[in-house]
């Protein structure tokens, strides 16, 4: 099987944490430890997929806040959208094959 990888851009962790109350299933994503390898079972992958979609929804609903987000986190909406889309794509592949997700920390 092809390897699917998503890189979390610098500043994304702060953005996601600060918007966590407006995102669906942030608590599942928060389980990923940025400093060590973390595994999520296959039954948790749909929750991460929903989380990725909630990021896209947040962007669509807060289009006027892009300058603030760029200033505060150094992230354009395009970069955030790319991350969310790639995360969703990895989730789709994992769900299609019944796999969980692995995260490799720094």
Description of each model-found segment:
Residues 1-106:
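Acidic (Asp/Glu-rich) sequence patches and key acidic residues
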């Amino acid at each position: 099987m092809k390897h699917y990888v998503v890189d979390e851009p610098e500043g994304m962790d702060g953005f996601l944490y600060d918007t966590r109350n407006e995102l669906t299933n942030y608590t599942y994503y928060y389980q990923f430890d940025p400093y060590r390898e973390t595994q999520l079972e296959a039954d948790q992958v749909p929750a991460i997929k929903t989380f990725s979609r909630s990021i896209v929804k947040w962007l669509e609903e807060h289009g006027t806040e892009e300058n603030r987000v760029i200033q505060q986190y150094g992230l354009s909406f395009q970069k955030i959208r790319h991350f969310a889309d790639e995360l969703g794509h990895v989730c789709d592949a994992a769900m299609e094959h019944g796999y969980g997700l692995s995260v490799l920390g720094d």
